[in-house]
């Protein structure tokens, strides 16, 4: 059997784990799920003949290396900043690796080493980034195959809740790492091309500069710019495009409300507020007023 190691058993990994477990018998896969919480790892594997859950501390070099060495493919569902040590282990032991995260400079720097060993390091293969890339290229290739020319490209994606579960004022729920939601949009200005002109939106204005779209059967949504769209211009083969824009979808009103947190400085994680875990929401907000 082929051995797949999944590191991280949090919210983002749930669907992946269930999918691979369902496929494990037919595809002859043995799934090892490693997490700092043994309970989290084993909640999927108890009683399953083709899976096991283990306690795996990614900061423990011996534990991490042993788990990687005993696998054929490693899927890291860790926060993006922790992928790099796993990637180095995969190169050391000659293992393929998959993540759902954007390619960091540190990960890109390992490209030649991975290629030299004949390894596949596949990143940006989740929902966003991931499915958006694949659906984009499917549409672009279809247009080109028919002799069409791309003048404008806009791609919208977002982790939205099902209408029947939409029962709070934010019209939003955490389905992935909450920290990543809080930090969304940070790390540099959003960059894109609009009608032949380069545009930049700094973080402090990101959630105030939105546009609206209508999705048939589901209603009106808003979109804010998603990171640096320009880096995909050559990857998508859109060198002569007049508009290139990738956006994140939210329900109408989300961005305006979230912008209040941004302007108050509540999304800044560069400092720690002592005893904040024991404060009421009112007390915490009052710190910034």
Task: List where the protein language model places each region.
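Conserved N-terminal Rossmann-fold NAD(P)-binding element of oxidoreductases
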Residues: 4-9
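Rossmann-fold cofactor-recognition segment
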Residues: 47-60
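Hydrophobic/small residue at the entry helix of a nucleotide-binding pocket
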Residues: 12
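C-terminal catalytic/substrate-binding lobe primarily of soluble NAD(P)-dependent oxidoreductases
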Residues: 145-289
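Rossmann-fold NAD(P)-binding glycine/threonine-rich loop
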Residues: 101-123
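Conserved Rossmann-fold cofactor-binding substructure of NAD(P)-dependent oxidoreductases
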Residues: 58-70
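ADP-ribose/adenylate-binding Rossmann-like module
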Residues: 89-107
